[in-house]
Amino acid sequence: MFSLRTAQPAQSLFRAATNTYSTSLPRSAIAARSFATVQSDIFKPTKYGGKYTVTLIPGDGIGTEVAESVKTIFKADNVPIEWEQVDVSGLDAGNKHSEDLFKESIASLKRNKLGLKGILHTPVERSGHQSFNVALRQELDIYASIVLIKNIPGYKTRHDNVDLCIIRENTEGEYSGLEHQSVSGVVESLKIITRAKSERIAKFAFSFALANNRKKVTCIHKANIMKLADGLFRSTFHKVAESYPTLETNDMIVDNASMQAVARPQQFDVMVMPNLYGGILSNVGAALVGGPGIVPGCNMGRDVAVFEPGCRHVGLDIKGKDQANPTALILSGSMLLRHLGLDEHANRISKAVYDVIGEGVTRTRDMGGQASTHEFTRAVLDKMESAL
């Protein structure tokens, strides 16, 4: 795997980024900046006049509120980014305006190569409408989802010493969108697993593990029942593992993995899995360390990288109430900055967020506090100013 900015192997860049962890920041705040491809350096973010142009898709629900928090913090820190905002919504999916905005968001991401994204709502009751979130990942082939699950210092949860990474294949599996009603009352839904994409995500997971000084990679599957589909994923994983003899490997059935994650999450390091299992275990993992409001994530492809909260929660129930926790999107934005090599900005912003949470004075309701979104953002800004 190579850097997105140079032909230098990304491993050294990962390590350079994670070195900061030893000072004050959790490793989740020091996520590696350059892991879009395991093949070649073809990633060229757009930069004009000394600034990077980044696509911003606030998303539905609390998206606009937390996106404003990120924009305010980035502006205060003079981050060299210009936002190209596209207000696409999944709530209005199906009408021409919404479809046009979705196409505009795709074009923007193809042009800029980088995006910061909230979560787009997918109506459960609307038949025939594919999730915009899934369609975007498939259209751009951003095949690897990375969710970083780690305790925040000073914020006590049920488990201590949790530090794991969930890597999820983003473009096939049960999310292929191939389902139909053959006769009334009988639905067929197709799960697609290919050797090529299983191999690609396995190589990504092993490369990520090496680059971030991780020790073990676990394959999550249901090959005891889906012997062909998950059997192919599992066997491909073990074949790829032969090229990484320094890493410990094992595999685990998803039912057991869910139980083990709740009972003893410390046993996991890097976990790689098909699409559906990744969605489930990302949410389980978030619950271990404080909930969806604090877990950052990103989606990587060969040409485009999109950073978004690790748990794909829309938050329609608290929309407009100034109650949302912006931490997940802020930290996802910090990951984006490291991806660009803007480590100084990323470190300053991440440290301020973790210091505010660690002090316990200004926390949003999901973390047991009473602070509003604006109050939390103001506290982060104050921390950044006091550090100068």
Swiss-Prot record:
EC number: 1.1.1.41
Sequence positions that bind substrate: 137, 168, 255
Transit peptide as recorded in UniProt: 1-35
Keyword ATP-binding found: no
Co-factor binding details: Binds 1 Mg(2+) or Mn(2+) ion per subunit.
InterPro entries in the cross-refs: IsoCit/isopropylmalate_DH_CS, Isocitrate_DH_NAD, IsoPropMal-DH-like_dom
A GO BP entry: tricarboxylic acid cycle
Keyword vocabulary terms for this entry: Magnesium, Manganese, Metal-binding, Mitochondrion, NAD, Oxidoreductase, Transit peptide, Tricarboxylic acid cycle
Keyword NAD: yes
Domain of life assignment: Eukaryota
Site (Critical for catalysis): 175, 222
Catalytic activity: D-threo-isocitrate + NAD(+) = 2-oxoglutarate + CO2 + NADH
UniProt-annotated binding residues for Mg(2+): 255
Molecular functions (GO terms): isocitrate dehydrogenase (NAD+) activity; magnesium ion binding; NAD binding
GO cellular component entries: mitochondrion
Subunit-structure text: Octamer of two non-identical subunits IDH1 and IDH2.
Function: Performs an essential role in the oxidative function of the citric acid cycle.
Family label: Belongs to the isocitrate and isopropylmalate dehydrogenases family.
Protein name: Isocitrate dehydrogenase [NAD] subunit 1, mitochondrial
Species of provenance: Ajellomyces capsulatus (Darling's disease fungus)
Top-level taxonomy: Eukaryota, Fungi, Dikarya, Ascomycota, Pezizomycotina
The gene coding this protein: IDH1
